[in-house]
Regions:
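Glycosyltransferase donor-sugar binding loop
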Residues: 25-29, 232-248, 264
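Membrane-proximal helix-turn-helix segments that form the acceptor-binding/catalytic region
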Residues: 100-109, 134-154
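Donor nucleotide-sugar binding/catalytic pocket of nucleotide-sugar-dependent glycosyltransferases
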Residues: 145-187
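Conserved donor-binding/catalytic core segment of Leloir-type glycosyltransferases
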Residues: 194-221, 234
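Nucleotide-activated donor-binding/catalytic signature segment of Leloir-type glycosyltransferases, i.e.
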Residues: 247-272
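Acidic donor-binding loop of glycosyltransferase active sites
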Residues: 273-290, 303
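Conserved acidic donor-binding segment of nucleotide-sugar-dependent glycosyltransferases
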Residues: 324-332, 340-346
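A short, well-ordered alpha-helix in the C-terminal region of glycosyltransferases
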Residues: 348-362
Length: 414
């Protein structure tokens, strides 16, 4: 989600009519993000092209006061929140997490045009896979928090099923569905001829340890190597902040085996090379809490995708016209079978890769930002015409789906 926010900010910064301030949290340590050697990465200096105000702190109950104080200094025209339910705190600090989710409603009540991009909703989260304790109480609190978020001027969700849930269960009138989008402008056509030379690199990338698990993939991969000796498994990304040391345990077990590569946290500038050098992206998750950033980046760099058969990912593939082959959750045999089928067929690789690349052309970051800015402009015009303030104003515009494009759906290779 942080990477997504970075790319939103980069695209907004390109607009000469926009003055952007990024309101970030005060980082003290990032021990959950380690390099290829398992060493925690060091905190970098702020990017010089951005105006960053670090005004809130993770797991702090004082974040509403901190953010409201900062907004009184900035006096923005639009306040845009990029959120998941754990943005402001973990389940070990439920008051801080809940207080943070109330901030958008408070900001709107103070008279600011407020928008939330919400990456998941709790009705679609597998609580057991996400290691949620006291599930009943957590769901009750999440329902109240959702109602608080819906007091924003508008909300964007990244899967159509999420919008349906918010409309049907909460009777929300201010919810948009928009594509997650690729993390960049119009991509360059990849050089397919380089793939598999010398290795077929199978990429798994994410924040590991909770519902994003590696056990199934590592169980499947020895069978892949029997059939495809030049296959190589590349694991990249950080641990989930509640699961330090997770991917490092696999790295220790497979130390010295050159068919396994562990990259750890990958800086944004190295992401293009990581994807471009891969043959396929695998999403071996047990469940999902939203749309998939790695799947969209696979499209951006023209890669086939193999994924656990998760309902949200099927919706994503259909709605955004992705070529994805699915395997039953936790089924290592079927995952291995699909990897062998893909890597042994250059024709199938290119067909899926080209399909995903053309899907990426229809969901670039500039296109997405234009949709957001049009929506913000409409909200501001409505606000000025209404002349009301705060939570008393009811939006006079209807929530819309983003455009969908009549591009063919992916049919599994036969």
């Amino acid at each position: 989600m942080n990477e997504y926010g970075l790319h939103l900010a980069r695209e907004l910064q390109k607009n000469p009519l926009i003055s952007l301030t990024v309101m970030g949290d005060r980082l003290e340590e990032v021990d959950f993000a380690t390099d290829a050697n398992g060493t925690p990465i060091s905190l970098a200096e702020e990017l010089p092209e951005f105006d960053v105000l670090r005004c809130w702190k993770f797991n702090s109950v004082s974040n509403p006061h901190r953010i409201m104080k900062a907004l009184r200094q900035i006096r923005p025209d639009v306040v845009w929140f990029n959120l998941v339910f754990s943005t402001f705190g973990t389940q070990q600090f439920p008051v801080a997490a809940f207080a943070g989710l109330c901030i958008p409603a408070m900001v709107r009540a103070a008279g600011y045009n407020t928008h939330v991009t919400l990456h998941h909703i709790m009705e679609h989260v597998d609580m057991s896979a996400a290691n949620i304790k006291a599930e009943r109480m957590f769901r009750m609190a999440s329902s109240v928090a959702t109602r608080m978020l819906l007091l924003s001027n508008s909300i964007t969700v990244l899967l159509p099923a999420y919008r349906r849930t918010l409309v049907e269960r909460y009777r929300a009138q201010n919810v948009h569905f928009r594509s997650h989008g690729i993390l960049g402008a119009r991509p360059e056509r990849p050089d397919f001829s380089r793939r598999g030379k010398p290795d077929h690199r199978v990429l798994a990338i994410g924040h590991w340890g909770t519902y994003k698990r590696l056990e199934t993939l590592f169980e499947a991969f020895p069978r892949v190597l029997e059939e495809i000796p030049n296959a190589k498994l590349v694991v990249a990304g950080a641990n989930h902040h509640t699961m330090p040391g997770y991917w490092e345990s696999f790295a220790e077990k497979y130390r010295g085996n050159d068919r396994y590569e562990f990259r750890g946290y990958v800086p944004e500038d190295d992401i293009p090379g990581l994807y471009a050098s891969s043959s396929v992206v695998v999403l071996p998750y047990n469940s999902s809490t939203g749309s998939s950033g790695p799947a969209h980046q696979a499209c951006q760099y023209g890669l086939p995708i193999i994924s656990s058969d998760i309902p949200e990912f099927r919706d994503m593939a259909i709605d955004e016209h992705m070529a994805v082959d699915f395997f039953p959750i936790g089924d290592a045999f079927e995952l291995g079978k699909q990897l062998v089928s893909l890597l042994s067929s250059a024709e199938k690789q290119q067909a899926m890769a080209e399909h995903n690349f053309f899907a990426a052309l229809r969901m670039t970051m500039p296109q997405l930002i234009r949709e957001y800015l049009r929506s913000f402009d409409l909200q501001e015009r409505t606000r000025l015409m209404d002349g009301g303030s705060g939570l008393r104003r009811a939006a006079s515009w209807s929530a819309n789906r983003s455009r969908t494009y009549p591009y063919g759906r992916w049919a599994p290779w036969t």
